[in-house]
C-alpha cells in the first residue's frame, strides 16, 4: 500500500479487482455509515477501509485502516492519511461524506475526489490473518510494482490456496472475472489469450478487529451461510451495502458478472438439450430391449432354480435412482453440463418408473434393470462430457459389471483423483507448536488455529504444510452413494468402518493429550527455541478468574484455544491471542521468532531491534569508580553516525541525527561487571540498545536515543549499589540470557 491513493488518482487498472463500484456482484461484507460510531457487541469482525479506483474497490494498508478506524470511533470529520502513511501526504478522508480528497488543487480542475467505504470481514479472512495477495503491474518476470487485489478476490484466492488447488478459474466463481490463477508458478493469465503476470502472497499486519451490533452479527452469519452453500468459496463474510460513492468521470466497461455468465450458460444448455432429445429417445429404446432380455433370463432362471422371497435391501426406489444419477456429475469435465445432467437424470428416472412398477415382484430383475439403467446413464453422461466419443453400447452383462465396479470404487477413486491432483498446500513458512486432533481440524474450518502460533510466512514457497485429511475433502465434494450390497458384504463394511473410527478416536485422544499436557513442542529448531517458554495451564476459576490481557475475554480452558502462561513472568493469555501478537510483530527484515509479554514487556527469544549501524568497543583503565575501590574500570565506547532511515525506522527516507556520539560509559571491572559487559555486547549485536525517535532532553525528532537499558556516562554517577543488578534485569527483560 505504498501508493494506494496515488494509484486511485492516476486511474490504474486493477485486474481481478472485484465487482465495479456501481454493481458489486455477490459481495460478502458489511458497510457502515460514515458518521456512526463503532459497533458494540460480543461478535467480532475485521474492519477494512477501502477506496475507489476506476470503478473497483481496493483496500488501504492496515496502518491507514487503523488510523481511519480510530478517527471514525472519535467521530472526526477530516483525517490526514500522511499521519499513517507518509506517501499519502496530499490526501485526506472526509469521514462524514466517506470521500478521499486531495489538497493538491490545480487551476480549473478542482479537488480530486474518490469514494471511500468501511467494510467488515471475518477474522479468518486474509485481512484478519495478516496475509495479502498482490499482482505485478509489469510482466511475469518483473518483481516490482506490486498491486493488491480486491479484498473479495483475495478471499477467494486464499480459499483455493488453502485447499491446495493447482489452478483457480475466476470465471467459475461468483465474481465472474476472466482470469486464471496458477498456484504452481504463481502467475495470473487473462482469458482467453491475455497477458501473463506474476502474483505473490505476502505477510502484513492484521487489520483492526471491531465488535459488531447484534443486527450486523446476524446478517454476517446468515449471509455467510447463504454464500457458502451457493458458491462453495470462502464464506464468513457479510452482505455488501455501499452507502456513499462519488461518481467517477472515467470508468472502464464493467466485467461480466456471475449473473450474466449464468444467463449465457443457460442459453447454451437449452440448445444442447434440444440436440440431446433424439439421443435420449435412442437410450430409452435400448433400455426396453435390455429389460426384455433380463425378463427372459429371469424366467429361465426361475424355471430351473427354487423361488426365493424378495429382499428389501436390494430394492431401489425411483428417488434413490434419481439421487444416484444426479450425483454422477463428479465425472463431468466442465461445470457447464451440470444442468444437462440434472435434466437427463430426471428423464431417465421418470422413464424407468413404469418398468420398475411392472417388475416390482421380481427382485432380481428389478435389481438388474436398475444397474442397467445406471450404466446407460453413465455412458450417456460420458458421451456428453468427455472430449472423444465412447464406443458403441456394450451388452447388458458387461454394462452391469462396469456399473457395479464403478459404483463400489467411486468413493476411493474420487478421493484418489483429488489427492493426486492436489499439490502440497504451500502456506509459505508455517510452523506448529502442538499436534492437533482431527476433530479440531475439521471443526475450525477457516478459523485461526492453535497451530498458527509460529506462522511467520514472508512470501516464501520453500516449506510445505501437511495437506487436509480426506475427511475434510469429502465434506466439500460428496461422492455418490453405492448400490445395495450383499448382507455379508454390508456386515464386513460396517465392521471395517467401526474399526477405522475406533482407531481415529484413539489417535485423536492421544494427540489431544500430547497437545495439552506439559510444554508445547515444535517441529523445527526455531519453534523449539520459542515454545519452551510457553506452557498450557488450567486458568483459575471464579472468584480468582482473570481475563486475557489482549482480548479481555474470560480465560476458559479449551482444546481449540487453551490458556497458556509464560515461563518467567507467569502471565496468562489465550494461545490464539499470542499467535496474533507474534504475527503482528513479524517484520520482513526480521525472521527471528520472539514473544514479548503484553503485560510486563519481557522478551522470550531473540528479538532484533532497529538500532542504526554503529560500533561498540571497550577497554580497561586503571581508575577506580566511587564505591568500587581497588577495582579497575571498564570503559565502553558507542559510535553511531548520522544517515538515512530505512523501512524499519519510523520515517523511511528521512535523515536521522546521531547527537552526542561517540558516547562513553563505565562499568566496574568485577565478575558481575564483566557479565553485564557480555550481555551489553549481545544486546548491541541484536540492535536493542539504541533506536530512532524523539529526544527526551531536546524534544527533537529523528535522533538516536537510548532504549530501556541504563548506562553510566559520568564518574560522579557512582556509587550505585543496585546498578549492576538492575542492568542485568533490564537486559534479561530484552531476552538477553545465557
UniProtKB/Swiss-Prot annotation:
Composition bias type Polar residues, residue spans: 216-233, 249-258, 377-391
Which pathway, per its entry? Protein modification; protein ubiquitination
Picking any one GO biological process from the record gives: negative regulation of Notch signaling pathway
List Phosphoserine occurrences by residue: 425
Region annotation Disordered: residue ranges? 216-316, 335-361, 377-440, 467-506
Q: Which Gene3D superfamilies match?
A: 3.30.390.130, 3.30.720.50, Zinc/RING finger domain, C3HC4 (zinc finger)
| Compositionally biased tracts (Basic residues) | 295-311
Any Pfam family: DTC
Cross-referenced InterPro entries, in alphabetical order?
Answer: Deltex_C (IPR039396), Deltex_C_sf (IPR039399), Deltex_fam (IPR039398), WWE-dom_subgr (IPR018123), WWE_dom (IPR004170), WWE_dom_sf (IPR037197), Znf_RING (IPR001841), Znf_RING/FYVE/PHD (IPR013083)
The protein's job, in short, is:
Regulator of Notch signaling, a signaling pathway involved in cell-cell communications that regulates a broad spectrum of cell-fate determinations. Mainly acts as a positive regulator of Notch, but it may also act as a negative regulator, depending on the developmental and cell context. Mediates the antineural activity of Notch. May function as a ubiquitin ligase protein in the Notch pathway. Regulates the sorting and degradation of N/Notch via an ESCRT-III dependent endolysosomal pathway.
Report quaternary structure and partners. Answer: Homomultimer; the oligomerization is required for its function. Interacts with the ankyrin repeats of Notch.
Protein name, entry field: Protein deltex
Q: Which organism is it from?
A: Drosophila melanogaster (Fruit fly)
Write the lineage as a comma-separated list. Answer: Eukaryota, Metazoa, Ecdysozoa, Arthropoda, Hexapoda
Amino acid at each position: 500500500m505504498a501508493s494506494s491513493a496515488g494509484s486511485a488518482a492516476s486511474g490504474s487498472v486493477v485486474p481481478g479487482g472485484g465487482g465495479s463500484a456501481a454493481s458489486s456482484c455477490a459481495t460478502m461484507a458489511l458497510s457502515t455509515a460514515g458518521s456512526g460510531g463503532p459497533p458494540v457487541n460480543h461478535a467480532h469482525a475485521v474492519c477494512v477501509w477501502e477506496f475507489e479506483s476506476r470503478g473497483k474497490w481496493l483496500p488501504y494498508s492496515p496502518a491507514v485502516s487503523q488510523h481511519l478506524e480510530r478517527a471514525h470511533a472519535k467521530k472526526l470529520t477530516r483525517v490526514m492519511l500522511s499521519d499513517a502513511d507518509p506517501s499519502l501526504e496530499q490526501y485526506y478522508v472526509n469521514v462524514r461524506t466517506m470521500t478521499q480528497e486531495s489538497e493538491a488543487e490545480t487551476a480549473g480542475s478542482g479537488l480530486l475526489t474518490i469514494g471511500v467505504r468501511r467494510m467488515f470481514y471475518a477474522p479468518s479472512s486474509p485481512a484478519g490473518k495478516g496475509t495479502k495477495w498482490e499482482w505485478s503491474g509489469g510482466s511475469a518476470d518483473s518483481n516490482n510494482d506490486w498491486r493488491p487485489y480486491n479484498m473479495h478476490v483475495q478471499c477467494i484466492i486464499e480459499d483455493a490456496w488453502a485447499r491446495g488447488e493447482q489452478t483457480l478459474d475466476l470465471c467459475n466463481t461468483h465474481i465472474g472475472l476472466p482470469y486464471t490463477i496458477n498456484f504452481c508458478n504463481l502467475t495470473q493469465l487473462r482469458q482467453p489469450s491475455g497477458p501473463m503476470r506474476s502474483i505473490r502472497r505476502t505477510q502484513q499486519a492484521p487489520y483492526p478487529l471491531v465488535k459488531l451490533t447484534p443486527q450486523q452479527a446476524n446478517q454476517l452469519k446468515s449471509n455467510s451461510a447463504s454464500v457458502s452453500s451457493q458458491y462453495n468459496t470462502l464464506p464468513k463474510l457479510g452482505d455488501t451495502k455501499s452507502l456513499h460513492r462519488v461518481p467517477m468521470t472515467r470508468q472502464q466497461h464493467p466485467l461480466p458478472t456471475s449473473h450474466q455468465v449464468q444467463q449465457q450458460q443457460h442459453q447454451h444448455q437449452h440448445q444442447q438439450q434440444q440436440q440431446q432429445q433424439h439421443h435420449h429417445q435412442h437410450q430409452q429404446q435400448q433400455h426396453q430391449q435390455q429389460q426384455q432380455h433380463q425378463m427372459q433370463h429371469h424366467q429361465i432362471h426361475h424355471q430351473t432354480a427354487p423361488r426365493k422371497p424378495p429382499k428389501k435391501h436390494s430394492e431401489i426406489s425411483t428417488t434413490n435412482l434419481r439421487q444416484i444419477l444426479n450425483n454422477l456429475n463428479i465425472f463431468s469435465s466442465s461445470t457447464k453440463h451440470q444442468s444437462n445432467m440434472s435434466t437427463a437424470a430426471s428423464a431417465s428416472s421418470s422413464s424407468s418408473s413404469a418398468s420398475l412398477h411392472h417388475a416390482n415382484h421380481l427382485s432380481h430383475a428389478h435389481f438388474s434393470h436398475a444397474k442397467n439403467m445406471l450404466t446407460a446413464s453413465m455412458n450417456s453422461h460420458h458421451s456428453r462430457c468427455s472430449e472423444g466419443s465412447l464406443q458403441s453400447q456394450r451388452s447388458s452383462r458387461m454394462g452391469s459389471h462396469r456399473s457395479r465396479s464403478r459404483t463400489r470404487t467411486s468413493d476411493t477413486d474420487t478421493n484418489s483423483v483429488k489427492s493426486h491432483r492436489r499439490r502440497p498446500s504451500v502456506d509459505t513458512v508455517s510452523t506448529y507448536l502442538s499436534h492437533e486432533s482431527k476433530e479440531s481440524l475439521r471443526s475450525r474450518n477457516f478459523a485461526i488455529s492453535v497451530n498458527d502460533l509460529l506462522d511467520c510466512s514472508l512470501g516464501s514457497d520453500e516449506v510445505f504444510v501437511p495437506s487436509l485429511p480426506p475427511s475434510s475433502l469429502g465434506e466439500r465434494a460428496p461422492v455418490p452413494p453405492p448400490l445395495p450390497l450383499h448382507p455379508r458384504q454390508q456386515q464386513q463394511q460396517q465392521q471395517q468402518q467401526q474399526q477405522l473410527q475406533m482407531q481415529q478416536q484413539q489417535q485423536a485422544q492421544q494427540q489431544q493429550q500430547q497437545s495439552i499436557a506439559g510444554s508445547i513442542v515444535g517441529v523445527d529448531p526455531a519453534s523449539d527455541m520459542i515454545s519452551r517458554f510457553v506452557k498450557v495451564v488450567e486458568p483459575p476459576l471464579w472468584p480468582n478468574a482473570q481475563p486475557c490481557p489482549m482480548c479481555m475475554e474470560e480465560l476458559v480452558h479449551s482444546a481449540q484455544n487453551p490458556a497458556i502462561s509464560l515461563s518467567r513472568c507467569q502471565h496468562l493469555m489465550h494461545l490464539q491471542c499470542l499467535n496474533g501478537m507474534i504475527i503482528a510483530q513479524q517484520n520482513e527484515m526480521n525472521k527471528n521468532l520472539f514473544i514479548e509479554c503484553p503485560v510486563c514487556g519481557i522478551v522470550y527469544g531473540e528479538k532484533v531491534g532497529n538500532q542504526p549501524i554503529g560500533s561498540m568497543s571497550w577497554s580497561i583503565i586503571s581508575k577506580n569508580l566511587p564505591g568500587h575501590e581497588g577495582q579497575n574500570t571498564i570503559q565502553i565506547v558507542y559510535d553511531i553516525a548520522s544517515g538515512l532511515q530505512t523501512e524499519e525506522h519510523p520515517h523511511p527516507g528521512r535523515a536521522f541525527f546521531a547527537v552526542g556520539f561517540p558516547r562513553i560509559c563505565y562499568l566496574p571491572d568485577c565478575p558481575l561487571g564483566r557479565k553485564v559487559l557480555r550481555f551489553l555486547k549481545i544486546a548491541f549485536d541484536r540492535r536493542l540498545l539504541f533506536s530512532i525517535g524523539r529526544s527526551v532532553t531536546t524534544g527533537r525528532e529523528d535522533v538516536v536515543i537510548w532504549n530501556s537499558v541504563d548506562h553510566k556516562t559520568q564518574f560522579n554517577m557512582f556509587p550505585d549499589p543496585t546498578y549492576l543488578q538492575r542492568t542485568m534485569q533490564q537486559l534479561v527483560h530484552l531476552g538477553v540470557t545465557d
